[in-house]
Amino acid sequence: MKIFPALFVFVLLFGCSKNENSPEAADLNQNETAATSAAIPQQTYLALGDSYTIGESVSQAQSFPFLLVSKLNARGKNFAAPRVIARTGWTTSDLQKAVLAANITKKYDFVSLLVGVNNQYQGLSKSSYRSQFRDLLNRAINYAGGKPKHVTVISIPDWGQTPFGKKSGRDRQRITEDIAAFNAINKAEASARGVIYTNITTISNKVSTDPALVAQDGLHYSGKMHALWVDAIITAFNKAN
């Protein structure tokens, strides 16, 4: 006879518990997930540059700005789709005109700046590159709300190492030296303003031994290379957050 009270208590405690797989439990889990996502403020990213930033010869999803946001969000961040102001063939002067035309008034949580390869390719002066790059960098800092650590300057890849560069008929040693000189300028400007510098030039030189890192046009870089760039650039984002 004493078994019945104990059995009654057992049923009362355990028989009424919800199955984790029940619709009610699923609704609770979904609500908790939604609440967690809503609790993380959405962050914004502005990418300024040229063909390397826009991801010439690869899909948008494979370009480093979009890959970067995807990877950050997979790690628990909440970034909106990046805003990209970039076009194949742009020099620093072209990018200056583009950002002025864009009339950017919004502040971004993070800004990247990668430009200069077309200055080198077109034989433009390093002095004009310095002054124009400095202006672009100052604007980038302003777009980041005046926070230098929320900006990264990304080095210029050495296109002379690509299949196109090898077949171009140009002096590849001269290309390498010129790219190094332009990178010395953008690195110095970044350092002077306390901006994070990201070197992707060394990574990009791997095209010499890995054809899979080059896009089909033989000049630009594949999605695989953009992914390697992201591994380097994400360090700058981590420092800013």
PLM region spans:
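Alpha-helical cap/lid subdomain in secreted, periplasmic
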Residues: K97-N241
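Bacterial signal peptide processing site
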Residues: S17-E20
